[in-house]
C-alpha cells in the first residue's frame, strides 16, 4: 500500500434456412452476464460515475479483444443511488437474468453486508475490491466474498504505521491524538476496531467524529478539530464529504499535511473544487493512482473512445476512480479466465465456477503487462484462505 499526493438482409433471404441455423445459434451462445450495480445519480454520483464508466469500458474492451476465449460479456446496469435497499432490489432482479449473474460488485459496504447473506444461497461471488467487510478476506469463513487488493483494516493499519514513521517510530505516538472523521455508515465504521486496537497498543488517543450522510454539514466536526487540535486527522469519506472536509480544514486552519484519507478519499472529485488549498493533503492509493500513460488506457482510447464506443467523457479515462472501475472489471474477467481454464475454455461459466476462478487467480507481471496493466498494479494471487490476495 502506498501514499500519494493528490494532485443484419435482403441477401439472406436467398439462403436456405439450414444455412442460417449455425450462425444464429452461435450468436446466441457464448455470452457471460455481468450485472453492473451503479450510482450515476444522487449525492455520490460524482464519484460513482467515473468508476461505472471505467468498469463499462473495460468490459467493452474485452469484447473488442474477442471476449474471454471467445465468450463475450453481456452487461446490464442497474441504478442504485448508493442505497442499500436499491442494491438489494437490483441484485434480486438481475441475479437470474440473462442465464444467471456471474458476479456482483456492489461498490458499497452497506450493500456488501446485505449481499453477503445472499451470495452463498444463490452461489454468486461478490468482488469488493478495496471495500466491504474487512474480515471477509478470510476465505475459510467468507467463501463467496473477495475483497481483492485491500481491506479497510489494511488501510487503517497502513495509516497508523505511516504516521508512526513520520513521528520517529510507533512508540512516539504515545500521548498523541488521532481524529477519525468518518462517514456515519457501515463503510465509515469499518476501520474503528483496528484503530482502537492500535490506540491501545501504542498509547495514542483516538477521537471518533462521525459525519451524517451525505457529508455536506461538518461545521460542528471541524469546530471540535479546531478546539482539540489533533496531531493527525484520518478522513474516511465518500463523495462530497471529502471536498467538504478539506474546505473545512482550510477554514479552520488545520494543516492539510496532517490529513490522511483512505483510498476512497483520494481522487480528482475530492480536490478539484478545493484547488491549491488542497496542497499537502495525503491519501492512500489502492495500488494505482491516475494512470494516463498506461497501455490499457491508450487501448481504451484507441479502440473505444476514438470510435465513439466509449462510456463517459474521454478526458476522465485514466483518472483515479475510472482506473478503479477498470481494474475491478479486469479482476472479474481474469477470474472468469481462470475458471474457464478448469471448466472449459470458450464456455459460459456458472457463479460457482467463477468463485473457483477468483479463488485461484495468479496475476503475474507478465500477465498484467499482456492486459495493459504493467506498472499500474502489483502482482496478486488468491487461495482458499486468502480472498484479498497477496
Residue ranges with predicted function:
Residues 85-89, 96, 134-135, 143-253, ...:
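Extracellular/periplasmic Venus flytrap/periplasmic-binding protein
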Residues 31-33, 46-53, 65-139, 148, ...:
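Beta-alpha junction/loop-to-helix N-cap segments that form part of ligand/metal-binding clefts
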Residues 249-326:
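Extracellular/periplasmic periplasmic-binding protein-like sensory domains
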Residues 53-75, 168-171, 200-203:
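Signal peptide-proximal N-terminal region
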Residues 94-107, 125-129, 177-182, 229-239, ...:
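Periplasmic-binding protein-like
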Residues 16-26:
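C-terminal segment of classical bacterial N-terminal signal peptides
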Residues 309-322, 333-390:
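Segments of small-molecule ligand-sensing domains
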Residues 32-56, 78-85, 107-108, 181-190, ...:
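Extracytoplasmic "Venus flytrap"
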Amino acid at each position: 500500500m502506498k501514499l500519494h499526493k493528490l494532485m443484419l438482409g435482403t441477401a439472406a433471404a436467398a439462403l436456405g434456412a439450414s444455412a442460417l441455423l449455425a450462425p444464429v445459434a452461435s450468436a446466441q451462445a457464448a455470452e457471460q452476464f455481468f450485472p453492473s450495480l451503479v450510482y450515476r445519480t444522487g449525492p455520490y454520483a460524482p464519484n460513482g460515475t467515473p468508476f461505472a464508466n471505467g468498469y463499462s469500458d473495460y468490459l467493452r474492451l474485452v469484447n473488442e479483444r474477442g471476449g474471454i476465449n471467445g465468450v463475450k460479456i453481456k452487461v446490464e446496469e442497474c441504478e442504485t443511488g448508493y442505497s442499500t435497499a436499491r442494491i438489494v432490489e437490483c441484485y434480486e432482479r438481475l441475479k437470474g437474468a440473462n442465464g444467471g449473474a456471474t458476479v456482483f460488485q456492489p461498490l458499497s459496504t452497506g450493500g456488501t453486508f446485505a449481499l453477503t447473506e445472499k451470495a452463498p444461497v444463490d452461489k454468486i461471488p461478490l468482488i469488493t475490491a478495496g471495500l466491504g467487510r474487512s474480515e471477509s478476506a478470510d476465505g475459510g469463513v467468507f467463501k463467496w466474498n473477495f475483497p481483492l487488493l485491500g481491506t479497510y483494516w489494511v488501510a487503517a493499519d497502513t495509516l497508523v504505521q505511516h504516521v508512526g514513521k513520520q513521528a520517529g517510530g510507533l512508540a512516539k505516538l504515545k500521548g498523541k491524538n488521532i481524529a477519525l472523521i468518518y462517514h456515519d455508515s457501515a463503510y465509515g465504521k469499518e476501520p474503528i476496531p483496528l484503530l482502537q486496537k492500535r490506540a491501545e497498543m501504542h498509547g495514542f488517543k483516538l477521537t471518533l467524529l462521525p459525519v451524517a450522510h451525505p457529508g455536506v454539514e461538518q461545521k460542528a466536526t471541524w469546530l471540535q478539530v479546531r478546539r482539540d487540535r489533533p496531531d493527525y486527522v484520518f478522513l474516511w469519506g465518500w463523495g462530497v464529504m471529502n471536498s467538504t472536509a478539506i474546505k473545512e480544514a482550510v477554514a479552520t486552519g488545520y494543516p492539510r499535511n496532517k490529513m490522511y484519507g483512505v483510498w476512497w478519499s483520494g481522487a480528482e472529485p475530492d480536490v478539484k473544487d478545493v484547488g491549491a488549498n488542497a496542497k499537502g493533503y495525503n491519501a492512500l492509493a489502492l495500488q494505482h493512482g491516475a494512470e494516463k500513460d498506461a497501455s490499457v488506457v491508450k487501448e481504451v482510447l484507441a479502440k473505444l473512445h476514438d470510435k465513439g464506443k466509449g462510456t463517459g467523457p474521454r478526458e476522465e479515462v485514466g483518472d483515479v476512480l475510472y482506473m478503479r472501475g477498470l481494474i475491478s472489471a479486469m479482476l472479474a474477467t481474469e477470474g472468469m479466465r481462470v475458471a474457464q481454464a478448469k471448466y472449459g475454455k470458450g464456455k459460459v461459466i456458472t457463479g460457482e465456477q467463477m468463485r473457483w476462478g477468483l479463488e485461484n487467480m495468479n496475476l503475474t507481471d507478465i500477465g498484467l503487462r499482456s492486459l495493459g496493466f504493467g506498472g499500474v498494479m502489483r502482482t496478486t494471487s488468491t487461495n482458499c484462505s486468502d480472498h484479498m490476495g497477496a
